[in-house]
Design a protein with these regions (language model features):
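Membrane-interfacial amphipathic/re-entrant helices at transmembrane-helix boundaries
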Residues: 1-65, 101-106, 335-336
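Alpha-helical transmembrane segments within multi-pass membrane transporters and channels
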Residues: 100-141, 288-292
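Hydrophobic core segments of alpha-helical transmembrane domains in multi-pass membrane transport
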Residues: 27-40, 68, 112, 141-148, ...
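Transmembrane helix-bundle core of multi-pass membrane transporters
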Residues: 133-198, 225-228, 247-259, 305, ...
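Single transmembrane alpha-helix segments in multi-pass membrane proteins
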Residues: 36-41, 46-100, 124-131, 266-283, ...
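Inter-helical junctions in multi-pass inner-membrane proteins, predominant
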Residues: 42-53, 149-155, 196-197, 230-268, ...
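Helix-loop-helix "hairpin" substructures at the membrane interface of multi-pass membrane proteins
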Residues: 103-111, 117-122, 174-252
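Transmembrane alpha-helical segments in multi-pass inner-membrane proteins
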Residues: 237, 252-315
């Protein structure tokens, strides 16, 4: 059982404990490095253009996985994050069309804050109603998807070239400049990682995920923490939506985009070492896993596997690794 005081009062550096907590995350990053090295052998002219493509196109799922990780660590799960991606993508494309970069940035800030407040209210509903997270968020996913279609009935809209450059390193959305995408990923991920491990609220989320009753008895405001977890998840899902509109240059309200993104985010969270039972894992591992989940498709394509078969292989691999990750996470939790 993990409590806030247990985590916060630790004064020495326990290498054994660190290995138990971060060993899987490190392994996921090593696996990602191996896959990239393998991919360079499959592509004859692998270079900065391919690096930029991987960096920018994995941004949406990476943001979504980090948001999902925060919620799952707190003992919940959000099946509506993918729908928030679609909704914010549609709103951004509609509002940013033919606007200046400055106005687009103001709109982006408003969208992120609005999504955080909106999803934070979902956390409040879950806490007050005691209805399981999976039921409430499944319902909100349909609400968000319907709102997306009201905002943007079909693919369309647009975004300023300067806004696209911030995420893709190119005003056209393509090119070999991968630094902007990496910077856009690192800043929020590091901020969330520090929040989870260095702030009292972040440590409270681990305590709640480990044992909500014990956390409550130790003085943790579990309701407030639940709201914050869902607010952070909503804000990061909005970041995923903004990254999507920056990459594609248009909005797309299709329901399938959101549902696929949600399932992939859950897969990335588990693959990254976060236990679905809560209280275990890190957002750093979830990022590496998200890139791997995204990366499987181009790898299978480079191997010459047809798209239909590739989807079966990809799903099977993810399922197997998720089961292994779940078993190891459970074993690690029992060891602690």
């Amino acid at each position: 059982m993990t409590s806030v005081s247990d985590v916060a009062s630790s004064t020495g550096f326990d290498w054994a404990r660190w290995r138990r907590r971060q060993g899987w995350s490190i392994g996921v990053w090593v696996l990602l490095a191996v896959l990239i090295a393998w991919y360079t052998q499959l592509i004859p002219r692998f270079g900065t253009f391919q690096v930029a493509s991987i960096a920018k196109n994995s941004l949406p799922l990476s943001f979504l996985a980090v948001g999902q990780a925060v919620i799952v660590i707190s003992g919940g799960i959000d099946l509506g994050l993918g729908a928030i991606l679609v909704l914010t993508n549609s709103v951004a494309a509609q509002l940013m069309h033919e606007q200046s970069l400055g106005m687009a940035l103001l709109i982006a800030v408003g969208i992120v804050l609005g999504a955080a407040v909106l999803n934070g209210s979902v956390g409040w509903v879950i806490n007050r109603s005691r209805v399981p997270d999976i039921v409430v968020t499944l319902a909100t996913s349909f609400i968000y998807s319907g709102l997306a279609l009201l905002v943007l009935p079909g693919p369309g809209g647009g975004t300023p070239a300067g806004f696209r450059f911030l995420f893709t390193g190119s005003e056209s959305g393509s090119g070999s400049n991968f630094l902007p995408a990496i910077v856009m990923l690192i800043i929020p991920v590091v901020a969330v990682a520090l929040f989870m491990r260095r702030s009292r609220t972040g440590l409270s989320l681990y305590a709640i995920g480990s044992d909500p009753n014990a956390a409550y008895l130790s003085g943790v405001d579990t309701g407030r923490a639940k709201i914050i977890a869902y607010a952070v998840g909503g804000g990061l899902a909005a970041m995923a939506g903004l990254a999507t509109v920056a990459i594609t240059g248009t909005g797309d309200p299709r329901f399938s985009i959101g549902s696929n993104a949600t399932l992939n985010s859950v897969a990335a969270v588990v693959l990254g070492g976060v236990a679905l039972t809560g209280g275990v894992g890190s957002v750093i591992g979830a990022v590496a896993a998200a890139i791997i989940v995204f990366f499987l498709s181009p790898i299978l394509s480079a191997m010459g596997i047809d798209p239909n078969s590739a989807q079966v292989v990809q799903g099977t691999l993810i399922a197997l690794v998720m089961m292994l990750a779940g078993l190891l996470a459970l074993r690690r939790r029992r060891a602690e």
